[in-house]
């Protein structure tokens, strides 16, 4: 709380736990946020208003981040047509509500609704803090107030996105677990049903205090991959002794690191197509999905022009 006295307590949303040991497991998952559609058109923007339970102290750490000289506030205002943005998290203190989602994967629908509301309160409070608090540098604040929620988007929900960005939650432990070695093509993936190509990208999972008294974000990863990689059919199906006739194209059998790349929407569409094809073949043959012959699935996917293997071309890929 007092930057001159490490024993004075912790600021809001700073964990009192230590960083995890290498190789150890825990319940922490990468942070969630709402991806917002903003506009700087004077006739199509809604100013950022004060949330009902707003508490400026929740953003004390951000005030200190600004005081340190940080200025990357607009780095994820990705522009889309009609003077709008797809605005996402960026930087040490941003729209990601770090630590606010640990209970989400196994929570009831009622508890999940509470967690989603907490994220909304946090993020709307953040916007109001940046727009109004005197600790925000005036040049950044002036530029920030050129923006607002797009008035013609999400008109039935106060111009706020309906869906929280659930980057990761539960993951299955199936017949094959995709890992970093697979994504980096360091081992042969069996029975490919599609490919991924995005960076191994995961957001922070916690914010804690280092021994010297400084706050540290932990969990952010951004590792490029050399070439597109294969995704195994066996990572879409559970172990036969645990469950049959279930295909899982989203919460796939994967390590956290590998899922950082697999979790992209185009990959989900690719795996969804392959899972649907496997389901049809299993029904036609009256067999469990674990009993489906891969060569038959491969033939059908090839006929449907699903890309199952990376073939390098002279002009790149």
What are these model-predicted stretches?
Residues 1-317:
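Flavin (FAD/FMN)-binding glycine-rich loop and adjacent Rossmann-like elements that form
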């Amino acid at each position: 709380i007092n930057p001159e006295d490490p024993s004075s307590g912790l600021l809001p949303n700073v964990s009192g736990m230590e960083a995890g040991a290498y190789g150890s497991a825990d319940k922490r998952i990468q942070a969630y946020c709402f991806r917002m559609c903003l506009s700087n058109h004077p006739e199509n923007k809604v100013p950022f208003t004060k949330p009902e339970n707003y508490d400026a102290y929740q953003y004390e750490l951000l005030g200190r981040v600004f005081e340190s000289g940080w200025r990357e506030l607009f780095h994820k205002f990705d522009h889309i047509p009609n003077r709008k943005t797809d605005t996402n998290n960026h930087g040490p203190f941003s729209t990601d509500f770090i630590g606010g989602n640990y209970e989400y994967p196994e929570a009831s629908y009622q508890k999940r609704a509470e967690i989603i509301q907490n994220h909304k309160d946090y993020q709307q409070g953040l916007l109001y803090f940046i727009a109004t608090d005197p600790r925000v540098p005036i040049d950044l604040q002036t530029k920030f107030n050129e923006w607002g929620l797009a008035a013609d988007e999400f008109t039935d929900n106060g111009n706020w996105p309906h869906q929280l960005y659930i980057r990761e939650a539960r993951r299955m432990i199936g017949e094959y677990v995709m890992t970093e070695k697979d994504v980096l093509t360091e081992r042969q993936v069996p029975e490919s049903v599609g490919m991924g190509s995005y960076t191994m990208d995961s957001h922070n999972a916690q914010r804690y205090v280092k021994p010297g008294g400084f706050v540290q974000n932990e969990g952010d990863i951004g590792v490029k991959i050399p070439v597109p990689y294969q995704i195994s059919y066996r990572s879409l199906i559970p172990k036969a002794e645990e469950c049959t006739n279930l295909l899982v194209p989203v919460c796939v059998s994967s390590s956290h690191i590998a899922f950082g790349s697999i979790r992209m929407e185009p990959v989900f569409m690719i795996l969804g197509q392959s899972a649907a094809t496997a389901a049809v073949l299993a029904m036609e043959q009256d067999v469990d999905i674990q009993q489906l012959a891969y060569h038959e699935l491969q033939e059908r996917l090839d006929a449907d022009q699903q890309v199952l293997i990376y073939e390098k071309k002279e002009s790149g890929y």
